[in-house]
Design a protein with these regions (language model features):
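Extracytosolic ligand-binding ectodomains
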Residues: 1-174
């Protein structure tokens, strides 16, 4: 996986040398604004990516988040904005439910808790404490000299986590 300036260098050299011509490319994270913005008009088209298409998510939850974010910061959110927001909202919900800072009470409060998010409700599984926050999957494209995601769909994390029996095999009880 390549990040920011390394990704820009790879894309620039790959485009120059025809590395991506007639080749399917899958690139995790590249659809996030944090990665598309530095690519600008060099964004390769048609890559299959995960990311955050903040400009095309049309749900009441995301609309409320987007409006509040833009009003406060006069900018658009990045995926890091969502992750940070969800981390704090989840911690606050767990603390409120536990009504304590005792570690065992916090663990018990976190197990199975549901929390609203800009992507819809998420929860933390009781069996392994994994969040069900999902990911947007789509393709890269150019619009007005900038990289964007198109043909996106949100994939719920709960649909891709291992079933309880598999978790039990992987994490035997002590």
């Amino acid at each position: 996986m390549l990040f920011r300036s390394d990704l820009v260098k790879l894309v620039r050299e790959g485009n120059t040398r025809g590395l991506f011509k007639d080749r399917a490319v899958v690139s995790f994270l590249t659809g996030e604004p944090e990665y598309l913005d530095p690519l600008k008009d060099e964004t390769p088209e048609g890559w299959i990516v995960t990311g955050y298409p903040w400009y095309s998510i049309k749900t009441p939850e995301h609309d409320a988040f987007l409006k509040a974010y833009q009003a406060k910061y006069n900018d658009y959110p990045r995926l890091g904005s969502i992750v940070g927001y969800e981390t704090i909202k989840s911690a606050a919900a767990i603390l409120a439910k536990a009504n304590s800072t005792d570690p065992e009470k916090l663990i018990a409060a976190a197990e199975g808790i549901a929390v609203p998010s800009p992507f819809g409700e998420i929860s933390f599984r009781k069996i392994d404490h994994q969040s069900t926050l999902g990911a947007f999957v789509g393709k890269t494209a150019l619009k007005d000299g900038k990289g964007i995601m198109v043909d996106t769909s949100y994939r719920k994390g709960s649909d891709y986590l291992p079933i309880d029996a598999e978790v039990e095999k992987l994490r035997p009880k002590e």
